[in-house]
Amino acid sequence: MIKDIDSLSQPIINIYSQIELDLIKEIARRFDLNDEIGGTMEWQLKKLDESGVLNADTVKVIASYSEKSEQEILNMLKKAQLANINMAELEEAYRQGSITVDPMNIKTNSAFAEVLELSYKELSNTYRLIQTKALESAKQAYMNVINRSYIEVATGTYDYQTAIKRAIKDMAKNGISGATYKRNGKLVQYSLEGAVRRDTLTAVNKLANKSSETLCDELGAEYVEISSHLGARTHPTNPIANHAGWQGKVFKIDGSDKKYPNLKESTGYPDDILGLGGVNCRHRMFPFFPGISTPNPIRFNEEENRRVYELTQKQRAMERRMRQLKKEQAAAKEIGDKETVKKLNKKISEQSTKIDDFCKKNNLRRDHSRELFKEQIK
């Protein structure tokens, strides 16, 4: 059984963070601050003509990571499938006659293998869609730099160097889009790294929970216990979307009894995207055997949970700002904008101190993996 299942997805997220950074640099390096015809119509036409070369090079960027990412995906999913399984507890349940199937045979079970194969196919397809969106986004980002710079120079709003610096900064700040989702009726663009993080964490937990479900079916287990963590999301009116309300409890898979309510009615699993196993849900479920399993004694105060959830959301916003600054810095280096690089070094240092102080003040763990590693921006 693995305690920190989220850590399994980090190698994949790191790969796609690097891909996004490489794409930003690939776009930026195509612009020369000292171009003699910079900002003219001749320059615009020349740059538009070069877009085909950019498209080929961005495909190469993604392809260069494909073999490594495929192996990491498989390693991640194999570990995730066993993350919710407590073999010692299952063996004790088998010894006491609570289950009739030897748990040692589970790993070679065909149903288990099918769950893993389906998860791998689904996630691979998700990544392909994200990659396609990223390639389209990179092309559009390049075109935006050209067209915006040309208009600003042609209208006399800015000189060529200033226009390029501004356009490159905004391109890097916005990042490369990996997906578009609807939120409250509005379209929301996710960066490549953000889309991969969201979909990978969801897939990993979905696989772990689906494997638990399959395990319960194979063993004839009737109950599951849900994990719990401080900072679980809350909702004032929807009990299924209020993860803090049902986390840490035991539920009956089919039907209910006096002690344990029904799993689906209480958590929405597996169909409700707002509930257990839904988008961005980190909760996991484990086979539970009354009289054998030891219930998790940890219970979180709802007010404290809400406070930590709100603080965590603030921390995520600060991390996003740090990623933006580092992307801007990488792009500025590519065009030789030393002045901007110097300014961004200062801003990055200040933002790092800000995050550090915030985490220490509120007793939160700083997650450097969400800020882009230093070696990623060299």
Language-model regions, residue ranges each:
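Domain-core detector
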Residues: 1-274, 289-378
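An acidic, gly/pro-interrupted, aromatic-rich
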Residues: 286
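Catalytic core of tubulin tyrosine ligase-like
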Residues: 283
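Short, solvent-exposed loop/turn segments at the edges of secondary structure
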Residues: 276-278
